[in-house]
């Protein structure tokens, strides 16, 4: 085992020989990070990425100034999808160490799950991983049901079944109940719905290779919302919450769905498929119908839903949509408290009407006349939320995954959003 490289924090600028803008320097004791009070967490994360890039795989966070958030910022930048890294953590009090340990367990689970190859992580495996994580955190407070394949069709989950039927791996709906009250009749406080497309080829509206090569990550919404529930439980969530993961492959075969097909949903809506690569909203619709039936105070769905959200925000922010201004502001306050980046994008009543079809109530994609793709996607989902004006948040997870490394992040999943959603769920 190699000796650990000591990483210390300093509020003094680096020696002038390192340059006036230097944020880190090397000394006889190890590496010093020079905080300037402007964006200290970002500075630590960027420095950690550079330290990892130098091939240093064993570090000790030493000296004064370390706390949970600073140690976590270091790990967020230091962790990568391949190779082993060892960190000797700073001395923290019990509460801070517990918080750090829970982040390491749960958010690393989210990142590792999103990074897993599609060959290893199909719909059933994703659902089972979610069950294992949540049962490990909450034990007997968890109950669940897994419905798959033809059982979905027979029970009316036609959006999920339609999208997933083209794969040899059957589509799966995970319906999970976290009930800490012990009362089977306890009201449901929140319902969480996640898009779990374990690989998205685009179907017959096939993607180019440059857009398909990262589509193992199209289940990022499901992983994020699962991690958020698990993390909220570790922070003392004492209200009943239900989780719905809509898991499928979107592949091409003789049994795959086709353009012009019409899906009949349980809430009476019909949808014409005019783009098989707009499949996420088709599976989420089934989960949102179930969520609405629970009459919760809060519904949150999370999905890597549109390229339009990434065009607007890049990979740095998650996109937030809601008709409920007060609730949207609560989510944004939670994001600020957790130092995670969310940005609200427009969602208006007219977006609900920008999906016209000649043969059904809705088209699953907007036409060229209605180019606000992220907003029309949110508008589509609103048709499956019973009381869409209140208590519903849609998160288009544009910050879930990066195809290549940047100064703060390695290539792959980020885990962003888990803490924000957990904060909202546990806020009084």
Curated annotation (Swiss-Prot):
<keyword id="KW-0378">Hydrolase</keyword>
<dbReference type="InterPro" id="IPR000819">
    <property type="entry name" value="Peptidase_M17_C"/>
</dbReference>
<dbReference type="Pfam" id="PF00883">
    <property type="entry name" value="Peptidase_M17"/>
</dbReference>
<keyword id="KW-0963">Cytoplasm</keyword>
<dbReference type="GO" id="GO:0070006">
    <property type="term" value="F:metalloaminopeptidase activity"/>
</dbReference>
<feature type="binding site">
    <location>
        <position position="195"/>
    </location>
    <ligand>
        <name>Mn(2+) 2</name>
    </ligand>
</feature>
<feature type="binding site">
    <location>
        <position position="200"/>
    </location>
    <ligand>
        <name>Mn(2+) 2</name>
    </ligand>
</feature>
<feature type="binding site">
    <location>
        <position position="218"/>
    </location>
    <ligand>
        <name>Mn(2+) 2</name>
    </ligand>
</feature>
<dbReference type="GO" id="GO:0030145">
    <property type="term" value="F:manganese ion binding"/>
</dbReference>
<dbReference type="Pfam" id="PF12404">
    <property type="entry name" value="DUF3663"/>
</dbReference>
<protein>
    <recommendedName>
        <fullName>Peptidase B</fullName>
        <ecNumber>3.4.11.23</ecNumber>
    </recommendedName>
</protein>
<feature type="binding site">
    <location>
        <position position="279"/>
    </location>
    <ligand>
        <name>Mn(2+) 2</name>
    </ligand>
</feature>
<dbReference type="InterPro" id="IPR011356">
    <property type="entry name" value="Leucine_aapep/pepB"/>
</dbReference>
<comment type="function">
    <text>Probably plays an important role in intracellular peptide degradation.</text>
</comment>
<comment type="similarity">
    <text>Belongs to the peptidase M17 family.</text>
</comment>
<feature type="active site">
    <location>
        <position position="281"/>
    </location>
</feature>
<feature type="active site">
    <location>
        <position position="207"/>
    </location>
</feature>
<dbReference type="InterPro" id="IPR008330">
    <property type="entry name" value="Pept_M17_PepB"/>
</dbReference>
<comment type="subunit">
    <text>Homohexamer.</text>
</comment>
<feature type="binding site">
    <location>
        <position position="200"/>
    </location>
    <ligand>
        <name>Mn(2+) 1</name>
    </ligand>
</feature>
<dbReference type="GO" id="GO:0005737">
    <property type="term" value="C:cytoplasm"/>
</dbReference>
<dbReference type="InterPro" id="IPR047620">
    <property type="entry name" value="M17_PepB-like_N"/>
</dbReference>
<keyword id="KW-0645">Protease</keyword>
<keyword id="KW-0479">Metal-binding</keyword>
<keyword id="KW-0464">Manganese</keyword>
<dbReference type="GO" id="GO:0006508">
    <property type="term" value="P:proteolysis"/>
</dbReference>
<keyword id="KW-0031">Aminopeptidase</keyword>
<feature type="binding site">
    <location>
        <position position="277"/>
    </location>
    <ligand>
        <name>Mn(2+) 1</name>
    </ligand>
</feature>
<feature type="binding site">
    <location>
        <position position="279"/>
    </location>
    <ligand>
        <name>Mn(2+) 1</name>
    </ligand>
</feature>
């Amino acid at each position: 085992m190699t000796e650990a490289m000591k990483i210390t924090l300093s509020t003094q600028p680096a020696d002038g020989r390192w340059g006036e803008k230097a944020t880190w320097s090397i000394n006889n004791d190890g590496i010093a990070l020079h905080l300037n009070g402007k964006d200290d967490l970002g500075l630590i994360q960027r420095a950690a990425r550079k330290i990892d890039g130098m091939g240093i795989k064993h570090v000790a966070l030493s000296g004064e100034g370390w706390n949970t958030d600073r140690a976590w910022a270091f790990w967020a930048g230091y962790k990568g999808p391949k190779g082993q890294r060892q960190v000797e953590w700073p001395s923290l009090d019990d509460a801070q160490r517990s918080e750090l340990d829970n982040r390491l367990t749960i958010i690393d689970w989210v990142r590792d799950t999103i990074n897993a190859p599609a060959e290893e992580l199909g719909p059933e495996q994703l659902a089972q991983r979610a069950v294992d994580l949540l049962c490990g955190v909450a034990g007997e407070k968890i109950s669940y049901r897994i419905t798959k394949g033809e059982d979905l069709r027979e029970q009316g989950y036609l959006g999920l079944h339609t999208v997933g039927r083209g794969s040899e791996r059957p589509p799966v709906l995970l319906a999970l109940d976290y009930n800490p009250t012990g009362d089977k009749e306890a009201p449901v406080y929140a319902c969480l719905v996640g898009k779990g497309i374990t690989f998205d080829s685009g179907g017959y509206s096939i993607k180019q290779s440059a857009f398909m090569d990262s589509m193992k990550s199209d289940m990022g919404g499901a992983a994020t919302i699962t991690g958020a529930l698990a993390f909220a439980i570790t922070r003392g969530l004492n209200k009943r919450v239900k989780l719905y993961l809509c898991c499928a492959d979107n592949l091409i075969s003789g049994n795959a769905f086709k353009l012009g097909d019409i899906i009949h949903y349980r809430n009476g809506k019909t949808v014409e498929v005019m783009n098989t690569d707009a499949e996420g909203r088709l599976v989420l619709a089934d989960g949102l119908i179930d969520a609405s039936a629970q009459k919760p105070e809060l519904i949150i769905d999370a999905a890597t839903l549109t390229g339009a959200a990434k065009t607007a925000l890049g990979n740095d922010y998650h996109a937030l949509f809601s008709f409920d201004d007060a609730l949207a502001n609560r989510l944004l306050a939670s994001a600020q408290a957790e130092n995670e980046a969310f940005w609200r994008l427009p969602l208006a009543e007219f977006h609900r009407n920008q999906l016209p079809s000649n043969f059904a109530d809705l088209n699953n994609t907007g036409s060229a006349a209605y180019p606000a793709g992220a907003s029309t996607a949110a508008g589509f989902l609103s048709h499956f939320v019973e009381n869409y004006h209140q208590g519903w948040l849609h998160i288009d997870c544009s910050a879930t995954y990066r195809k290549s490394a940047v100064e703060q992040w390695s290539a792959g999943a980020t885990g962003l959003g888990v803490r924000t959603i957990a904060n909202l769920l546990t806020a009084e």
